[in-house]
A protein has these predicted regions:
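Short, structured helix-loop boundary elements
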Residues: 22-23, 43, 65, 69, ...
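Amphipathic alpha-helical packing segments from all-alpha helical-bundle domains
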Residues: 77-85, 110, 116-117, 128-154, ...
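Helix-turn-helix
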Residues: 24, 32-66, 70
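Conserved hydrophobic residue
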Residues: 39, 157-158
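Amphipathic alpha-helical segments used for helix-helix packing
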Residues: 96, 108-128, 179, 183
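C-terminal peripheral helix-coil segments that are non-catalytic and often amphipathic
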Residues: 1-9, 106-110, 141-154, 169-216
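Hydrophobic alpha-helical connector segments
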Residues: 70, 81-114, 163, 167-170, ...
């Protein structure tokens, strides 16, 4: 059979093996970008990393953009799978907010290559946007806003703040850690997470005293 670029079927027709192979290639692409940069992450380089032929990558992906989109999706799903259970394990608004912040930053700590790759994917060396993730940003803000507003409705967080503005501020504080983690070997992301979680606990709480370990 002659394999054509992007010839692997989409949707329900894609087999379990094909889906697993696409995920494997996408993860390897993210790791390769983290190691050699966006420009250096060629199909040949990714194939070498996996010990497969370049043609096999071309069979599963129509081009580099297609592969990178899949890589970003894989990274996002990995993050959701890590973060969501830690939030849902908590039962109060303040505890869920702290878990949200600390889990996001813990995931970044444990998946540093993802952080580096996302920085590379977001911008070229000239600052030109390579991959447009505006929808993902809006979705992240919206989900956090829902958590905050729901906790306000349940009388678990202070009613006087704007949940949309607060969600933007929290996401900005989390994302600010990305370049520091990527570039500064001395950056203590665990300390940063604890401090940021306390800052937003103080900004959103109803009663006196923080909800974190400082209260013990």
């Amino acid at each position: 059979m002659v394999m054509q670029p992007g010839a692997a079927p989409d949707g329900p027709e894609r087999t379990f093996i094909e889906t697993a192979r696409r995920a494997q290639i996408a993860r390897a692409a993210i790791d390769t970008i983290a190691e050699v940069g966006y420009a250096g992450a060629s199909f040949a380089r990714i194939a070498e990393r996996l010990g497969i032929s370049r043609g096999l990558i071309s069979y599963h992906f129509a081009g580099k953009d297609d592969l990178i989109k899949q890589g970003v999706q894989e990274a996002a799903e990995q993050a959701i799978g890590y973060i969501r259970p830690r939030i849902l394990a908590e039962s109060s608004g303040p505890a869920m907010l702290r878990a949200y912040i600390e889990a996001n930053l813990a995931f970044m700590r444990d998946h540093r290559s993802n952080v580096i790759a996302m920085i590379e994917i977001a911008r070229s060396a000239e600052g030109r946007r390579i991959f447009d993730d505006d929808t993902a940003v809006l979705n992240a803000v919206g989900a956090l806003e829902n958590l905050l507003s729901g906790s306000q409705t349940a009388h678990q967080l202070r009613p006087g703040f704007d949940p949309h503005v607060m969600a933007i501020a929290i996401r900005a504080a989390i994302e600010a850690a990305s370049p520091l983690l990527a570039l500064d070997p001395e950056f203590d992301i665990d300390h940063y997470a604890s401090e940021i979680a306390t800052v937003f606990d103080l900004a959103t709480r109803i009663g006196d005293g923080p909800t974190g370990p400082e209260a013990d």
